[in-house]
Amino acid sequence: MASMGLQVMGIALAVLGWLGAILSCALPMWRVTAFIGSNIVTSQTIWEGLWMNCVVQSTGQMQCKVYDSLLALPQDLQAARALIVICIILAVFGVLLSVVGGKCTNCVDDESSKAKIMIVAGVVFLLAGLLVMVPVSWTANNVIRDFYNPLVASGQKREMGASLYVGWAAAGLLILGGALLCFNCPPRNDKPYSAKYSAARSAPASNYV
């Protein structure tokens, strides 16, 4: 029962992490304009995402534009787009494996095979979590580096957007859920000990004089 509880918790955390990765990928809030200095137009906020950028006016009006080309993205966001998409696909594969190997499903009858499938699902979720962690941390590092770089103009400085925090949370959930599933050890097939008896040999009769 405890093993089944770990499975359910691991799958639930991994699914939440997968949904968080989708949200982080879709939200155009990876980098947000930093209002520094007097030359920044404070009446608008610029959001930069993986697929589009948005301009939010002080009146609340928002205009979004999809990137015309992949080359319009900086290098870190190009890599982030590819890695996040791979992560989402991997997580879908992990969810399917966890359904097949779940203790409450009848897709596979052998308990040992179920446990092995669940361990593979856990490894897949761990890889998906790392694929989210790398681009999010890379982008955050570039934002912080440019923010404190005196050679970068004030108008080019950005702050970390909400998508980065969502991505970190998604990575943590995927890694934690995958780790719980990896603890699902296959059952031992210990055969009961059977005592074997051999017939005692009769000693040859000795002749006494």
Swiss-Prot record:
Q: Which cysteines are joined by disulfide bonds?
A: C54-C64
Where does the sequence pass through the membrane?
A: 10-30, 82-102, 118-138, 161-181
Q: PTM Phosphotyrosine: list the residues.
A: Y208
**How is this protein named in the record?**
Claudin-4
| PTM section of the record | Phosphorylated. Phosphorylation by EPHA2 is stimulated by EFNA1 and alters interaction with TJP1.
How this chain sits in the membrane, per its record, is: Multi-pass membrane protein
- Sequence ranges on the Cytoplasmic membrane side: 1-9, 103-117, 182-209
Identify the keywords attached in UniProt to this record, alphabetized.
Cell junction, Cell membrane, Chloride, Chloride channel, Disulfide bond, Ion channel, Ion transport, Membrane, Phosphoprotein, Tight junction, Transmembrane, Transmembrane helix, Transport
Would I find Cell membrane among this entry's keywords? yes
Q: What is its main location?
A: other
Q: Which family does it belong to?
A: Belongs to the claudin family.
Its GO CC terms are: bicellular tight junction; chloride channel complex; plasma membrane
Pfam families linked to this entry: PMP22_Claudin
Ranges for the region named Interaction with EPHA2 are 1-103
Q: Which PANTHER family match?
A: CLAUDIN
Q: Where in the cell is it found?
A: Cell junction, Tight junction; Cell membrane
Q: So which stretches are on the Extracellular side?
A: 31-81, 139-160
Alphabetized InterPro entries for the sequence: Claudin (IPR006187), Claudin4 (IPR003550), Claudin_CS (IPR017974), PMP22/EMP/MP20/Claudin (IPR004031)
Quaternary structure (record): Interacts with EPHA2; phosphorylates CLDN4 and may regulate tight junctions. Directly interacts with TJP1/ZO-1, TJP2/ZO-2 and TJP3/ZO-3. Interacts with CLDN1. Interacts with CLDN8.
